[in-house]
Regions:
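Glycine-centered flexibility sites
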Residues: 3, 21, 41, 50, ...
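Flexible, glycine-rich phosphate/dinucleotide-binding loops
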Residues: 26, 50-54, 80, 121
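Internal hydrophobic alpha-helix adjacent to the cofactor/substrate pocket in enzyme cavities
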Residues: 34-61
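C-terminal catalytic lobe of FAD-dependent flavoproteins
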Residues: 69-131
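Central beta-strand plus flanking loop segment that forms part of the substrate or channel wall
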Residues: 6, 60-75
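FAD-site-proximal beta/loop scaffold in flavoenzymes
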Residues: 1-43
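Short, acidic/polar N-cap/turn motifs at the starts of alpha helices
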Residues: 3, 59-61, 92-94
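Short catalytic/ligand-gating loop segments at beta-alpha or beta-beta junctions
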Residues: 53-66, 84-89
Length: 131
């Protein structure tokens, strides 16, 4: 692992000790970004206030802000079965990771990469992953 192993309640193996942010690995996922930290903070605040609240993440693409070649990455789940389908042109790249698993609807969008002019489609792709 890359962080302190914690449950969805952000509890460690030591009673009354919690971890969040860059140092926490929630159910095997290490997410050193601002949006996961915000979700973790809300969940932990509720838990510490007496209402046990597991952290739940929305679809959270990572935006790499480079003027020459902007990039948005929404990685598929680590254990997802599927394949990448890539299309590109001189000014854009679209890569989609689609499900091949019978447990999920075959062909469902599980992750993506958008680059160049394709980054303008981020919200539409996030909605497809959320569906």
């Amino acid at each position: 692992g890359r962080g302190v192993p914690v449950s969805r309640l952000l509890t460690t193996s030591v009673p009354h000790v919690h971890a969040l942010g860059d140092c926490a690995e929630v159910d095997g996922q290490w997410l050193p970004y601002v949006m996961p930290l915000m979700q973790q903070t809300r969940a932990l605040a509720a838990t510490l206030a007496g209402k046990p609240t597991p952290v739940a993440y929305p679809v959270m693409p990572v935006v790499v802000k480079t003027p020459a070649w902007p990039t948005v990455v929404c990685p598929p789940p680590a254990d997802a079965a599927g394949q990448w389908e890539v299309t590109s042109s001189d000014d854009a790249l679209e890569a989609r990771f689609v499900s091949a698993s019978s447990a999920e609807q075959a062909g469902a969008l599980l992750g993506f990469v958008l680059q160049g002019k394709a980054v303008s489609q981020r919200q539409a792709w996030v909605a497809q992953v959320s569906a």
